[in-house]
């Protein structure tokens, strides 16, 4: 069972490791996304659920980060943890997002990546290695956070 993070100040924790396991999930429209499809880009993998208040609170900042850094060298992949598509669609109609929302029915990927608390995020560098992890809500559009992620972008 997953828990929602409490309102503590989350921060980017530096790591240098391969991603916990391969990512291959469909989005809400049925398109399959693989982490390998985004090789050469910075990928922010965010595990979330509509029932998780900190997850809902950080979504606008994830959307701002996606818009600020663009899509050619950066992408957010929001992995919804085991919720019905209708609930996710209702959430997205109220809060449209500028990045793919992937479906982890049965929480297989969530377990493989050892996610225990939501939201949980992993920042993957263009070479495919995990460079940062975050457990809990983070303001992804804060200047210090944007600066650290921007340093990972190709050509930086």
Sequence positions of predicted segments:
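N-terminal signal peptide c-region/cleavage motif recognized by signal peptidases
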Residues: 4-6
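Structural signature of beta-strand start/N-cap positions in the alpha/beta core
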Residues: 41-43, 73-75, 100
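Thiol/disulfide oxidoreductase modules built on the thioredoxin-like
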Residues: 90-98, 104-151
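Short loop/turn microsegments at loop-to-beta-strand junctions
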Residues: 20-21, 43, 118-120
């Amino acid at each position: 069972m997953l828990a929602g993070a409490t309102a503590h100040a989350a921060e980017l924790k530096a790591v240098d490791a391969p991603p916990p396991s391969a990512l291959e999930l469909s989005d809400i429209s049925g398109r399959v996304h693989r982490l390998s499809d985004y090789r050469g880009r910075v990928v922010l993998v965010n595990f979330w659920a509509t029932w998780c208040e900190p997850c809902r609170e950080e979504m606008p900042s994830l959307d701002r980060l996606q818009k600020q850094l663009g899509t050619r060298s950066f992408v957010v992949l929001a992995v919804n943890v085991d919720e019905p598509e209708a609930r996710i669609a209702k959430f997205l109609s109220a809060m449209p997002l500028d990045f793919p929302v992937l479906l982890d029915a049965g929480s297989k990927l969530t377990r493989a990546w050892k996610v225990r608390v939501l939201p949980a995020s992993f920042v993957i560098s263009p070479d495919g290695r995990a460079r940062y992890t975050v457990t809990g809500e983070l303001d992804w559009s804060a200047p210090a956070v944007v600066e650290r992620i921007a340093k990972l972008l190709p050509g930086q």
